[in-house]
Amino acid sequence: MTTPPADDMGTTPFRSLSADLAICDLPKLEQYQEGGPRITLLRDDGVARVVVFHFRAGQQLPEHQTSSRIYVQVLRGMLTFRTAGASTNAPAGSLLALEANVAHSVVALTDCTMLLTLTPSPLRHSLPEMQP
């Protein structure tokens, strides 16, 4: 298997270690911004989209949905993840799974880093998706 090149959305923060292995140093990407979370596309190879979010406490993603199944991993801090049917406070180390086409929102309770994986990549769907 060959590591896919940077996708059409820009350069990748991955560093190639060999023809089939690449690494991304997530702590080096940690940056915040005022007015909303900092969103960095890590990779979109058509199979999955991987995005990292850096939130300041109180920042949020308002209710939205995507045509992909999502996995949300809280790497640092704590956030609240809400759907119409449930709400949970997710601390660092939590992994949340959500089916496609389910409206949800996110609020950072503390400064927080969240890794989002969408599968398959929204590039394979016709529905609009959240753009990083």
Tell me what each language-model feature is:
Residues E34-G36, G46-T66, A100:
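Conserved short histidine dyad/triad with adjacent acidic residue
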Residues A100-R124:
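Ligand-binding loop in jelly-roll beta-barrel domains
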Residues L75-R76, P91-A92, T110:
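A cytosolic small-molecule/anion-sensing beta-strand core signal
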Residues S68-A84:
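Glycine- and acidic-residue-biased ligand/ion/polar-headgroup-sensing regions
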Residues P122-P132:
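Short, charged, intrinsically disordered terminal tails
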